[in-house]
Amino acid sequence: MKRNLLLLLMVFATLSFPLFANGTDEKNVDAANPYKGKDLVVATWGWSAGNLKKLSEDFEKKYGCNIVIDETSGNSDRLNKLIAQKNNPEIDVAILSDNFASIGIEKGLFDKIDKSVVTSYDDLYDFAKNADGYGPCYSLVRYGILYNADAVSAPTSYMDLFNGNYDGLISLPDMASTAGPYLLVSLAEDLGGSQENVTPAMELLKKEKSKIADFYMSGSSVQTGFTTGEIAVAVFMDMNVPLLRKSGLDIKWVTPKEGSFSAAATANVVKGCQNPKLAQLFIQYLISENVQNKVADVLSEAPCNSKATMSEEKAKYLASGEDAFKALKVFDLDYINSNKATWIEQFQKEIAN
């Protein structure tokens, strides 16, 4: 009897061992992957949400987490949301154009990059690195002139838009948008002014505002304007060329003689966020060579990692390589941001209304 009982206990112990072992292994797996089941909230433009989610699929698989997209549309709306949530942020990673990101940095909204985690940082082009150690640029689009070759002839400069050939068919960025202040300074320089003296440009826009069909805040209004024929020329982003061509329009890109200017997308870790380490890992993922090789195809934006490549087809309309980046018009973002509110107020009073 005792012998049978002993054998039974030995069998039970043998059968039970794998169960306990498996439980221990599962615990170890969870400990090794503390991000499993976590939601990483990434705030970006609504129009880019699907593409960013697609670009993030491998990150979700690697860490067992879920990328939740906060589709707060415009840069200004996203920045205001971050400011409102400063003491209790719901967002982990903030995607903003570089000029809006600089405002966020000034307001203390972001953590600095941990280069022991963001190990691809040194592979970025210099322009993509933040001098103070905050979030880098991971992609870039250019603003220049897009025109419908079936409707109008090619302009060569921003000033050409007011020569009478495009009356009523022009779309320009609103002053509260990313590109509005850049265009204002460019026009001021054409007219003998500067960023410190934008009066000539304000006077030009006030005089010629009847020729302008739309001052846009979102890219969707420009896309709609082209497809409906309400506009035929716009100061707009290069990334929209293939999309508009797919709609059957003969859209062409012009680099104005004043130069095209960039809007670089930055990724920052929100200070006090729920998942700071995972947010750092996500930024590393975004700027890694492997993911940067996909940026042009998935986002229709230029990658910022110097080791990244893109197809010849994409390089026809996206900035490609160091020479192309160096050719972009550069602005003093600190000066523009400190004067932007005044410019917006004047623009709304004298031009937009």
Segments predicted by a language model, with ranges:
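Short, low-complexity disordered leader/linker segments with a strong preference
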Residues: 1-40, 352-353
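Periplasmic-binding protein-like
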Residues: 140-141, 203-208, 247-271, 307
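Early extracytoplasmic/lumenal segment of secretory-pathway proteins
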Residues: 27-102
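A bilobed periplasmic-binding-protein/Venus flytrap-type ligand-binding module shared by bacterial periplasmic
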Residues: 144-151, 186-190, 263-275, 286, ...
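A ligand-binding cleft/hinge motif common to bilobed small-molecule-binding domains
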Residues: 100-103, 227, 233-250
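Conserved C-terminal helix/tail region of periplasmic/extracytoplasmic solute-binding proteins
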Residues: 326-353
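Extracytoplasmic ligand-binding site segments that recognize negatively charged/polar headgroups
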Residues: 45-53, 90-230
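Mature extracytoplasmic/periplasmic domains
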Residues: 270-328
